[in-house]
């Protein structure tokens, strides 16, 4: 950097000495310096003359005078011509038109002096460093002298400074208005450094049309690109937005991030040569490093640290960290105290400031409502921020700007808003000239912050001994936000700590130190006691035990309403408050930028909640409605919150719930999930109703129409779900974010407990009942159910997150890490009913009147037995950290069916979910509801069903006719001890009858419907529930197609593809895992994997029902192919899809039939799959003469086998489920299996056909249940339930491919391990 200018005008002879003579033409008295210098381009020597301000010459004066001339640099061809009055100078450069004067060096010249004017770049080369320094000082001093002299007058005649930005002109440069803090840069410079570059049409240069010759202007915090002959920068980039920069040869590039006004991208520019490019690079890196060090020394935050003597300021996290710094006073930092961003893009010249500016709206919207003095009716102070309303609110002009002088002249700083470029005394070297004495008024502070923002006027009438704010001695209405009574500019980015902290002299006891102007809405966080002296300038953040601790004093009227305002700026809410205060001035300096967060300390629960009913100030004038965020971390439960002291602590750990010992303060789940799901416009629920609006007990809650903001009868309306899923056209796309429970303004009942402190930030669409109510009291009715019930904040969370409960053997620990397309259920568990006839919840007609399936998390569902929600006080009231990772968009609103899903599966790659939990019904579906009716098996999912959490396995209405993406490559490792389902005696269902789980009806994002009475007569004739030994008998194919919901939906819906789901259950199962039936695949769906059925590898120690897995079958065919299943030897590492199956020769293929089609082998578990039919019965695969060579080549065949003889499992005979029932296959035990020791490398499944498979019916083209069945391995697994092909893995008969045929159950039992054959490579 150049050295600072010398104080005072330099000697008339400097550098190489004056070449003065008595020639009147030379106007000797105005010549400051002259001598030979070289021009940069060609190196020609020219004679340069530096003239100070004055007339054009004596001759001109004698002729009648001429307008005074600005300081200028002239050059002549030679000294002789200058002395001999040979003619006019070859060139005249007005110095006040210079953007900057810099020392430079390039490849040719080491000692350059560069002058950057509005329209050109001019550089001269000195012979040595001393000569360069002499000219540089002379130039800068002359410019500084001219500016200081022009402070109170207009520009001189020849001056172009009125049109220049920044200190040099009437308007502040958009990028350089903050340079003159202290004496770091010469006072002559609008910018610290200026380079002339040629922006190339590459990256942002092309997309933003930034090409051509620009001036790259570096200021303390920004770099601006000023086009030639332009006054304002075309683009201003914050240094903090620069991700990286570099140079190569003569090119220099900058990569900026998303927060830049241009958006993310790169800017490429070409300098004169590589030396200049390197200089640009190094200089910008140095500036970025300095800024980084400044921020490290002074932490970035939207809020202020409290206390003027704080050496370790408390940094409150801000919503958008790129907005501002914490501005410590110069007395503490010794560094520049400026807002983090310095300029506006395309702000009108009249609005420009001379010292700095705060970033108003986001950086790109400066010209509109951003912060132009003309745009919002708010003149800009010299600090670049809106002025506080006062008698001297005039738009800045050049005379205002320069009236106080610049450089180190703080004595000229006045009380006018246009106090000067250094009005805020930006460094320690500047005395605090404008700081008012502490005795200005009883409400002012003696601040060491250096800008004297000490006044804290109180509301009128609150404290009679204090003067009214409007009668402040200095006549200016100050605000505690920024504008102080001393007349310092109200700079929102410029607030000192004493404005927000509790300095020893702070009058914080009055809790309402603010004027009635919008600027002062940034309310100060109160110290907990009157003096705050013992806090030593810190804001109290401790956790009081009770209100006896140190609650701050409540004030009534305006002050009480002010307490609930967070320390913030730019507050905007999408709703209108119940009552509004009239804002005296439509200016909002304190609303300008910050979204401040305040931790307040009143309330009962140990969580932070927003303040009073009117929880955020609603001002009539919101100048920036597009960028307001209302983040309040307060704890006021109601205007009369007398429920005990809140500790002021906000739990920030994910999943960790804060507890408190209160009887009514079971803090359940202080967890806020922020998982991205389907996105739509936000909608917030403003007035949640009380329990008085609840329907009577047992009544169903009808689902409101999708897409509208719901109002739920939640407990006190404490949860505010600003879910962006609920869109409405009037939303402007912004939502208020509450980190606390806000009571309804109409319901200030202090007895109501606010529920969960966390907002549902997930853009997931709510269920059919909208965003769920916080309690299941809606199901039980009456307000008595709300008493003593904790606020389960997860009720507003996506279905993935819920508290575990083990009531009625129903544990909800099943977590899904799949990529569901449909809505993730909360693992709908259907509690055992007192009467089997009670069957399912809601009406039996399948209407969407289930109150809790869609809206209430499972842990809060009311149990018909207990009569109270499960999982409440009896359960662990803690937040369950989500172990379910959604890879695709969750769909929880019926409105999601407005957006068609792609039929092409988005394979997320092989996700493996390892669930260690005591799953009550993980592996076995809950018996009573599932066995309730035939329709229940096709319309309801159990929590144990892996498909119950899968998008395409989600049951719903049959109106959803879209295809679901296959949940490919999903492996579920379930270490659980499932409990056996209670067998039911109702007819019409079998335990294994889960044919409807993956039916088309199951692909809907709706909650499970109550089982509907089957409308088909054949469903009334289904066999009775089997004996325990018959648990694995699968339903007949006709039952799968004739049941009520399935029959009505399978023809009109294209089912999802739940391919490649492998559930490996390691646990002690009371009963065998229930088979899950894959749905038929649509004809046009591209099968992403040969394993379309749900393969469950159940490695369990069966304690009962072991023989149920065994099936009468023929001895194994030695020529039969095997299904090779590979477990990942690396222990469940999620492999990239590119490395999943690089080739099909990694194992010895049992049959080469699929080897040519390796592109479909993207399952996580199936490496090379080949199934060959049993030769028994001479049935062919899929009914053809030849088996298909690959899943993709299998022809869809339709078969409706007759209803008869679903063969029961015979527990007395060795099973052939896997293929070695007492035959030639050698028994294999898990303990001795090399495959188990090596991580279950390969499992050979021998799927055998059955005799009599020729008895299958012929295909019927209309049956979609068998569409594309043979296109995947699930379809090749055969049909189950017909007379010829019953069994879990029965070989397919002649075209008989019902939905029950695609389940391959591979069970490694503690005994009877003959069923498994582990194949080593």
Swiss-Prot record:
A motif (YXXM motif 2) lies at residues 594-597. GO terms for biological process: brain development; cell migration; cell population proliferation; cellular response to glucose stimulus; cellular response to insulin stimulus; cellular response to peptide; epithelial cell migration; insulin receptor signaling pathway. The modification Omega-N-methylarginine is found at residue 409. A motif (YXXM motif 7) lies at residues 1061-1064. The modification Phosphoserine is found at residues 303, 343, 362, 381, 385, 388, 520, 556, 573, 590, 604, 616, 675, 678, 727-728, 762, 796, 819, 907, 965, 1089, 1098, 1151, 1163, 1165, 1175, 1190. A motif (YXXM motif 4) lies at residues 671-674. Residues 1039-1055, 1163-1179, 1253-1271 have a biased composition (Polar residues). It is found in: Cytoplasm, Cytosol. Residues 191-295 form the IRS-type PTB domain. A motif (YXXM motif 1) lies at residues 536-539. A motif (YXXM motif 3) lies at residues 649-652. Residues 18-28, 435-456, 478-490, 930-959, 1139-1154 have a biased composition (Low complexity). SUPFAM superfamilies: PH domain-like. The modification Phosphotyrosine is found at residues 536, 649, 671, 911, 970, 1242, 1303. Residues 1-32, 51-73, 299-536, 834-871, 888-1091, 1110-1198, 1251-1275 are annotated as: Disordered. Its main location: cytoplasm. It comes from the Eukaryota. Keywords: Cytoplasm, Isopeptide bond, Methylation, Phosphoprotein, Transducer, Ubl conjugation. One of its GO terms (molecular function) is phosphatidylinositol 3-kinase binding. A motif (YXXM motif 5) lies at residues 734-737. Skeletal muscle, lung, brain, liver, kidney, heart and spleen. Residues 364-376 have a biased composition (Gly residues). Interacts with PHIP. Interacts with SH2B1; this interaction enhances leptin-induced activation of the PI3-kinase pathway. Interacts with GRB2. Interacts with PIK3R1. Interacts with DVL2; this interaction promotes the Wnt/beta-catenin signaling pathway. This is Insulin receptor substrate 2.
